[in-house]
Amino acid sequence: QLACLVVGIGIMLLLGAEPKTAAEYFRVIQNDGLAGYLRLDFATLLMITLFPFIAVALYAAFRQSRPAYALLTLVLLLLGTLLALANHSAFSMIHLSKLYAAAPLAQQPQLLTAGEVVIATDMWHGTAGFLAGIFMQGGFVFISFVMLRTSGFSKGTAYTGILANGLDFLHVFI
């Protein structure tokens, strides 16, 4: 996950941040080739795709000692992951960009509007994305507190999880 995060930051620093408007998305996708696609936040998508594996590993680690906490964490992480993946905007914007490029001038404003709707409801702006953040980061914070009460994880690991995921959890609300 750290590698995905570092790659995402590197892409942002080298190529620019993810586009903010539908017109910018369409321009970047149509004109910037691979660089345009890289700016669509696929690193975050890949990172979130790894969360179910972490959820299963945490469940396995705690299913004997704290079965209810393990199951709750598993459910929170899986629900959050599902919501986040279902609301990532990259594939929708790629599709709309292709339609926009082929559309007559009269139809292009409709496709720009459709693109703005996708942005407004994506994993960074929409209700499902908000809930995904609460479920995923809340699940990680919760299991980090559980780690404090077990001997299988060091206190440093638990506190690191609380701090890192706690900050990300707060980010959901800010």
Region spans (language model):
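Hydrophobic, aromatic-enriched alpha-helical segments typical of multi-pass transmembrane helices
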Residues: 1-174
